[in-house]
Regions:
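Asp-based phosphoryl-transfer active-site loop
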Residues: 1-3, 121
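C-terminal cap/substrate-recognition subdomain and adjoining C-terminal extension
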Residues: 42-318
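Short, acidic loop-to-helix structural element flanking the phosphoryl-transfer center
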Residues: 9-35, 43, 47, 85
Length: 318
């Protein structure tokens, strides 16, 4: 799994964490899911960010930060805000550079609505699947005003791609409360979510997260963020009604509850139990609304790239 970590401005012991995020990352790493962090934060913040991750008990495999100081020294001021020219080449280089050892390995990408994550990750997914070729990628990067040498590096990686479906899901945290319908243009593969329990529901159903781990995320939502059982179940219903859950594996969640109850105190124990009681009817809703991500048309990236170019957005506002 690849995950993105937002810029942290507080000290490590003061940094705010999105509800359920740290627990979900801990549980994923304990489930032997590979965690690769690609952050838009500058390299100078590495110590602070790593301290925060360690404070939360999170183990990661790779941690890539943006070389903003290097960009400034080279007078590359566009690159300071550019996400397309940073994240797409980084993703392509990481995947193609790993060679045969990652053949058949699926990725779940996690980002937020504060940057161009849905756009960049969808494009990356279509490149890896062979739907977006070298010529199209070049036109997109040129239109996005990416520096020429960065374009060349990205295209070298594109030429190394052995087409296969790589990206299973793209999870977008709605940190800025963007409406989920704004992401429909990217298809069902992109899953907008409001809290990390919703992300846990998705990755559990995808087979990446054990049911006991999902329940621990739910328990944290009660203990630290004052969710009750009804709110926990509504989180499932919200994702289900938007067509991102199949309504499977509810039996696993029910079966895992007794084990969780041995280690979780009140009120989390009662609220999680209430959530589990409410999930079966919501699973029926999920089965009725499920939208398979396969076979959807590719987004018009050439049209979309203007929306995600910071300079274009700035001109449009003036």
């Amino acid at each position: 799994m690849r995950d993105l970590v937002r810029t942290a401005l507080e000290r490590a012991d003061e940094k705010r964490t999105n509800p359920g995020a740290a627990t979900l990352l801990r549980e994923l790493s304990q489930a032997n899911v590979s965690i690769h962090i690609l952050s838009g934060s500058p390299e100078q913040m590495r110590r602070r960010l790593e301290a925060k991750l360690k404070l939360d008990g999170i183990v990661w495999d790779n941690f890539t930060l943006k070389p903003n100081l290097q960009n400034m020294l080279r007078l590359r001021f566009r690159a300071l805000r550019d996400q397309l020219g940073y994240k797409l080449p980084a993703l392509l280089t990481s995947r193609t550079g790993a060679g045969e050892q990652v053949a058949g390995v699926k990725e779940t990408l996690v980002g937020d609505d504060a940057e161009a994550d849905a756009f960049v990750y969808s494009l990356y997914a279509d490149v890896m699947e062979g739907r977006a070729g070298e010529e199209l990628v070049q036109r997109i990067l040129e239109r996005g005003r990416v520096y020429e040498d960065v374009i060349e590096a990205a295209l070298r990686s594109v030429r190394l791609v052995k087409p296969e479906p790589v990206v299973e899901r793209i999870l977008i945290h709605l940190e800025q409360q963007t409406h989920p319908r704004d992401f429909q243009i990217f298809g069902a593969r992109v899953v907008p979510f409001y809290n990390y329990l919703q992300a846990a529901y998705v990755v559990h159903e995808d087979g990446r997260l054990p049911a006991t781990s999902l329940l621990r995320v739910a328990a944290e939502m009660v203990t630290l963020h004052r969710f009750d059982g009804d709110a926990l179940a509504r989180s499932y219903a919200d994702v289900a009604k938007r067509g991102h859950l199949q309504g499977t594996k509810i039996e696993e969640i029910v079966a895992a509850l007794p084990e969780l109850e041995k280690t979780v105190a009140s009120p989390a124990r009662e609220e999680v139990r209430r959530m589990v009681e409410l999930l079966p009817p919501q699973a029926e809703l999920a089965r009725a609304r499920w939208k398979p991500p396969e076979g959807e048309p590719m987004p018009d990236y050439l049209e979309l790239v203007d929306r995600h170019n910071p300079r274009h957005r700035k001109r449009k506002k003036t």
